[in-house]
Amino acid sequence: MIQTQNYGTGRRKSSSARVFLRSGNGEIVVNKRSLNEYFGRETSCMIVRQPLELVDMVDKFNIYITVKGGGISGQAGAIRQGITRALIKYNQTLRFELRKAGFVTRDSRQVERKKVGFRKARKRPQFSKR
């Protein structure tokens, strides 16, 4: 039996996710653990489910995800973009709706580097006039 699957890659901050969509009953597995077990936070789980809820396909696919790098927020954003790209490969007509919601565009914001002589990226040491 040949099982068709759609693949999508997502990135956010320093996280990258590989997403595989297969037809199924709505099971989401992240790094061989269930979605709720992996993230724990409901907000992160909501971010992951957003593209599926938008196109009403929550119970249509089983999703297998490998994600690495970054923290919880970055990983959730990377998975969301990966699911979006996989859905577009599955059905090209979903692209307009997903783009309108802002899920197709990669969030290019990165952590600003710390500068020499500053305490953080922009925080300067206290200035003394005299």
Swiss-Prot record:
Family membership: Belongs to the universal ribosomal protein uS9 family.
UniProt GO cellular component terms: cytosolic small ribosomal subunit
Molecular-function GO terms, alphabetical: RNA binding; structural constituent of ribosome
A Pfam match: Ribosomal_S9
SUPFAM superfamilies assigned to the protein according to its UniProt record, in alphabetical order: Ribosomal protein S5 domain 2-like
Assigned keywords, A-Z: Ribonucleoprotein, Ribosomal protein
GO biological process: translation
Keyword ATP-binding (UniProt): no
Name assigned to this protein: Small ribosomal subunit protein uS9
Gene: rpsI
InterPro entries: Ribosomal_Su5_D2-typ_SF (IPR020568), Ribosomal_uS9 (IPR000754), Ribosomal_uS9_bac/plastid (IPR023035), Ribosomal_uS9_CS (IPR020574), Ribsml_uS5_D2-typ_fold_subgr (IPR014721)
Domain of life from the UniProt record: Bacteria
